[in-house]
Amino acid sequence: MQAAERDGVAGGLEATAAVAATGGGEASSEPPSPPKAASFDLLDLVRSYRRLELYLEPLRDAAEGVRALLRWQRPLCSLLVCLGLNFLLLTLDQAAWYSVLALLVLLPALLGYLQETYRVRPSERELLRRKYHSVRREDLRRVQLSRQEALAQVKCFLIQLEGFLSGLCYNCEAVYRVLYWENPTVSSQFYGALLGSVCILYLLPLCWVMAILNSTLFLGNSQFYQVIKELKASVEQSLGTKPLESAPEPAKPLPTDAPPDRTPTPTSTEDLTPGSVEEAEEAEPDEEFKDAIEEDDEGSQCSADFDLSLPDNGFMSKNDVIRSKVSRLTERLRKRYPSNNFGTCTGCGATFSVLKKRRSCSNCGNSFCSRCCSFKVPKAVMGATAPEAQRETVFVCAQCNQMLIK
């Protein structure tokens, strides 16, 4: 009986193998189907990028804290950290440093374990409230966005990606310029610093090398010197050693003879337009009271031009015609020059007056005198796209001028 069963099982296996071979032959005769093309969804890429931002948020916060310490945004904290690190680097031995590293490894593990162990278990009602009123990190894949929100997310991601790639390319170009000696001064400084670092590592102990590196990071940046300058200025102001700036004495008016009554002779065919008034406003002499002289010169220049644009009607004398034209010109110039001259210059601190006119920076909007706000830049530098923006210029302060021309 068992022998018959074994024969039956063997026959069934042979039949199955024959059917499989026949089917395999038919399958091999058919051409293989082309592989399915991999689909690329830009919105999924953006979601993954946002999730990565959430996961790396603690590292970003730590980097921001380190950057704030190195930039001396809080001078007292930066000073304490710098001195504390130097003290630890110079006093701790090798065994103590291994203990500190072990503590740094165990501390996050212990904090995570305690947080999970002693975490307050929320009630069912609290869980329902969190479910309907919060979005968790694991729920980001199931969030349904509208088309406008998706496009906004994709656009923001592409802008950030473009900025990151631009900065990376700029840094790579700077490295290549140093390596290929395009700027011999910078390249010599770089290789000299490398050789000096190797010599210091060979001659000095490691603790001293780390202390020098820490001091260089904290003390060798421009923010530290800015803090020192501010501290020095505050100390001088508190002690009263800084002399007060004396106000400029007004110049004595020169005696002038009464000009004869005469009509202005037409010297050009230029009409009084806003562009001509703006060009007259931009003219700057180099005298002490250039604003007052500029106002007088522009008034006479524009009055001569205005005489051509308004013909005589025959019922008024020449003096009446001139007075009417000058009154209209004065109204136009009053719009150009504000009557409120109170305040001080942001740059030099000079008080605005009739002789010291106020001028606003076209980039930052702060109020300056004509000496501090005397730099001209094209409007195209500030983002204007009109064709005339390449030719038209506006006044900016010195700080904005340095920022815009870079």
From Swiss-Prot:
Q: List residues in the membrane that do not cross it.
A: 193-213
Please list the GO terms describing molecular function: zinc ion binding
Ranges for the region named Disordered are 239-295
**Residues on the Lumenal side?**
93
Positions annotated as zinc finger (FYVE-type): 339-405
Q: Which residues does the annotation say bind Zn(2+) 1?
A: 345, 348, 369, 372
Compositional bias (Pro residues) at which positions? 250-263
Query: On the Cytoplasmic side, which residues?
Result: 1-71, 115-192, 214-406
Q: Which residues cross the membrane?
A: 72-92, 94-114
Q: What PANTHER family does its record include?
A: PROTRUDIN (PTHR14543:SF1)
Any one Gene Ontology BP term? neuron projection development
Coiled-coil regions listed in the entry: none
Which residues are involved in binding Zn(2+) 2?
361, 364, 397, 400
* Membrane topology (UniProt): Multi-pass membrane protein
| Major localisation | membrane
Tell me what this protein is called: Protrudin
Q: Where in the cell is it found?
A: Recycling endosome membrane; Endoplasmic reticulum membrane; Cell projection, Growth cone membrane
Residue segments, region Sufficient for homooligomerization: 1-97
Q: Report the GO terms under cellular component.
A: axon; dendrite; endoplasmic reticulum; endoplasmic reticulum membrane; endoplasmic reticulum tubular network; growth cone membrane; membrane; recycling endosome membrane
Record region (Sufficient for localization to endoplasmic reticulum tubular network): 1-210
The organism's superkingdom is given as Eukaryota
User: How does this chain assemble?
Assistant: Can form homooligomers (monomers, dimers and tetramers).
**What is the scientific name of the source organism?**
Gallus gallus
Enumerate the UniProt keywords alphabetically.
Cell membrane, Cell projection, Endoplasmic reticulum, Endosome, Membrane, Metal-binding, Transmembrane, Transmembrane helix, Zinc, Zinc-finger
Which residues lie in Acidic residues bias regions? 278-295
The protein's role, per its UniProt record: Key regulator of RAB11-dependent vesicular trafficking during neurite extension through polarized membrane transport. Promotes axonal elongation and contributes to the establishment of neuronal cell polarity. Involved in nerve growth factor-induced neurite formation in VAPA-dependent manner. Contributes to both the formation and stabilization of the tubular ER network. Involved in ER morphogenesis by regulating the sheet-to-tubule balance and possibly the density of tubule interconnections.
User: What SMART domains does the record point to?
Assistant: FYVE
